[in-house]
Amino acid sequence: MEKVMLAIGKFKEGEGHFEKFMSFMQSEEGMAERRKVAHVEKTVPGILPDKSGVMFKVHVHDEQAMKEFVSGRNPAMKPIYDECVESIQLFELSEVDIG
């Protein structure tokens, strides 16, 4: 079952963490790992103006793997997580009828 989630990440202090993180996420390895947990073509990104953090609206098809991915427990994600990420929060989203 597909679940829509919001991941909000904060980077460690210092220069270049945003660029390094995004470079990994857009690399072949990063894209392959993302495809294992979510539909990457449906992902909607957002960036804080000072590049100290990011958020992604993600359509997840493997919730447990997503939790491992954003927590740094995924072996492919761990090195970039350890170097660049201070924290990531994960939220479940549900659509609200405004009509």
Positions of PLM-derived features:
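Short S/T/G/P-rich N-terminal loop/turn motif that feeds into the first structured element of a domain
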Residues: M1-A76, S87-G99
